[in-house]
Swiss-Prot record:
Source domain of life: Bacteria
Cofactor: Mg(2+)
Pathway: Cofactor metabolism; pyridoxal 5'-phosphate salvage; pyridoxal 5'-phosphate from pyridoxal: step 1/1
Record-listed E.C. numbers: 2.7.1.35
GO process annotations (BP): pyridoxal 5'-phosphate salvage
InterPro entries: PM/HMP-P_kinase-1 (IPR013749), PyrdxlKinase (IPR004625), Pyridoxal_kinase_PdxY (IPR023685), Ribokinase-like (IPR029056)
Protein name as catalogued: Pyridoxal kinase PdxY
Magnesium listed as a keyword: yes
GO molecular function: ATP binding; magnesium ion binding; pyridoxal kinase activity
Positions contributing to ATP binding: 114, 151, 184, 211-214
């Protein structure tokens, strides 16, 4: 019997709705990954609503919880770490301490850093120290980085002028340490208005993927968290990078189709669960 992979997901959590771990955990489980959720914040709902309440996990609790897993002899079974939204650079450094501990227990363990800073339509939502930490420290340890366009712009200190420029910016991030960079949402002058575009960049090659852009009265939150989680999960399940990239684009599109059909603001993950596991659509990544 094939072993089920285990993934430590260090992200935010909302009681109502879907963002951070609340957007990623169930889909990752649904496609066959054992997820260990470590919630960096617990909020009533995501912060695009007019109000929310909740608490942030103290940074020192992150390595302490990981040591608790080590104490019961399970840390070596962790195949990957996924990190998302950071409340502070201190929280980020605590995560890197945990990643180092896990890689010591399992040298084959992977680390995907989703450098959450915001959304092109919503602006930056983190302090400058977090952006600096992600670029200067997290990128060096990450196997994979999955920025959106705003985050890639922040790392580059400029906006792109073309698709080729986006590719150059992703390659500059790749040079800081990751094995692969996935740009989850491209935005550049001349991009087709009816398309949603992504990039996958490695040292050897690059791929571009386009799918239809779906319209919503309010853009659902958690799409990036879902994207990063599914991409890492498919790699753990044996996909190569391009196959994981294509599967992720299709599965996320299926969720958005279901969400749109329901007229929902929150992602319809439960209703779309079979479409996540077995996407009906397929989008081909084109090598650049």
């Amino acid at each position: 019997m094939k072993r089920t992979p285990h993934l430590l997901a260090i992200q935010s959590h909302v009681v109502f709705g879907h963002a951070g771990n609340s957007a990623a955990v169930f889909p990752m489980q649904r496609i066959g990954v054992n997820v260990w959720p470590l919630n960096t914040v617990q909020f009533s709902n995501h912060t695009q609503y007019k109000q929310w309440t909740g608490e942030v996990l103290a940074p020192q609790q992150i390595p302490a919880l990981i040591e608790g897993i080590a104490a019961i002899g399970e840390l070596g079974n962790c195949d990957a770490v996924l990190s998302g939204y950071l409340g502070s650079a201190a929280q980020g450094r605590a995560i890197l301490t945990g990643v180092a501990r896990i890689k010591a227990a399992n040298p084959k363990a992977l680390y995907l850093c989703d450098p959450v800073m915001g959304h092109p339509e919503k602006g930056c939502i983190v302090a400058p120290e977090v952006s600096d930490f992600l670029l200067q420290e997290a990128a060096a340890m990450a196997d994979f980085m999955c920025p959106n366009q705003l985050e890639l712009d922040s790392f580059s200190g400029r906006k792109p002028e073309s698709l080729a420029d986006c590719l150059a910016m992703a390659r500059a991030l790749l040079a800081r340490g990751p094995k692969a960079v996935v740009v989850k949402h491209l935005d550049y002058p001349g991009k087709a208005a009816d398309g949603f575009e992504m990039l996958l960049v490695t040292a050897e090659a690059s791929w571009h993927l386009r799918r239809p852009l779906l319209a919503f009265p309010r853009q659902p939150v958690g799409v990036g968290d879902l994207t990063s989680g599914l991409f890492l999960s498919r790699i753990l399940l044996g996909d190569d990078l391009v196959a994981a990239f294509e599967f992720t684009a299709a599965a996320v599109h299926e969720v958005l189709l279901e969400t749109q059909a329901c007229g929902s603001y929150e992602l319809e993950l439960v209703r779309a669960q079979d479409r996540i596991a077995h996407p009906r659509v397929k989008f081909d990544a084109v090598r650049l």
